[in-house]
A protein has these predicted regions:
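Short, strongly hydrophobic transmembrane alpha-helices
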Residues: 1-9
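Membrane-interface junction motifs in transport/secretion proteins
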Residues: 11-44
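A short beta-strand structural signal in non-transmembrane regions
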Residues: 25, 120-121, 180-189
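Conserved residues at the C-terminal ends of beta-strands
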Residues: 28, 63-66, 188
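Structural beta->alpha junctions
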Residues: 31-37, 153-155, 187-189
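A structural signal for hydrophobic secondary-structure junctions
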Residues: 41-180
Length: 189
C-alpha cells in the first residue's frame, strides 16, 4: 500500500510540473511538434477572447520559444528561451522561486530580464543579478545580454536544464515575428 501511494504521489507531482511548465492544452503550428524552433501562428485579441470564453478554460496565455545557448567565460549550455506576455500566470513559478522575483513580462517591450533554473545557474556559475549572454543561430548569430531577475528550482531536470523565461516581446523579435505571431497558446482547464 505504501509503495502504491508513493508511486501515485510521484506521478501526480510529475504531472503537475509538466502542466506548470506548459499547460493542459497547447495550440501550436503542427510543424512545431518535435522542435523548439517553431513556426508562428497568428493569435490576436479576438482569438484570446474566444478561447477564454469557454467555461472549461480557466486561463489562456500566449508563448513563443527560441532555442539558443548561454555562454560564460568558463562554459556554454544549450537552452530554450520561452517568452510569455502580460497574461502569464506566475503562480507555478512563484511556488518554485528560490531567489529574486518574477518580472512583469510584456508583449510590447523587453525588460531584458530572465528567470533561470538553479540547476543552470549552478552549472554556469551564475547568480541573481548577473548579466548573461545568450546566442541564437538563424541566418547569422545573434546575441542578447539578459539580467537574471529570478532563480527557480522545480527539481524536474528535463525542464530545469532547458528553460529560461523572459518577455514574449524579446522572443518574438529574435524570431523576426509580428506582434500577433506566437509559437502557441497554452490553455489551463
Amino acid at each position: 500500500i505504501i509503495a502504491v501511494a508513493v508511486v501515485i504521489g510521484f506521478k501526480s507531482e510529475v504531472r503537475n510540473k509538466v502542466i506548470g511548465f506548459g499547460s493542459h492544452i497547447q495550440i501550436a503550428n503542427l510543424d512545431a511538434v518535435n522542435s523548439y524552433e517553431t513556426h508562428p501562428i497568428a493569435v490576436g485579441d479576438s482569438m484570446m477572447t474566444a478561447l477564454s470564453g469557454y467555461p472549461q478554460v480557466s486561463h489562456v496565455q500566449r508563448y513563443s520559444t527560441k532555442p539558443g545557448m548561454i555562454k560564460t567565460d568558463d562554459a556554454f549550455q544549450g537552452m530554450v528561451l520561452k517568452g510569455v506576455g502580460p497574461e502569464f500566470d506566475p503562480s507555478f513559478m512563484q511556488e518554485y522561486l528560490v531567489e529574486g522575483e518574477i518580472p512583469a513580462f510584456s508583449d510590447s517591450a523587453s525588460s531584458n530580464q530572465v528567470l533561470i533554473s538553479k540547476a543552470l545557474a549552478t552549472k554556469m556559475k551564475l547568480k541573481l543579478g548577473d548579466k548573461i549572454y545568450t546566442y541564437y543561430i538563424q541566418d547569422n548569430i545573434r546575441a542578447r545580454r539578459l539580467t537574471i531577475a529570478g532563480i527557480y528550482q522545480t527539481n524536474f531536470s528535463e525542464y530545469d536544464n532547458l528553460f529560461l523565461l523572459t518577455d514574449l516581446y524579446l522572443v518574438n523579435r529574435l524570431n523576426g515575428w509580428e506582434p500577433e505571431q506566437v509559437s502557441g497558446v497554452e490553455l489551463q482547464v
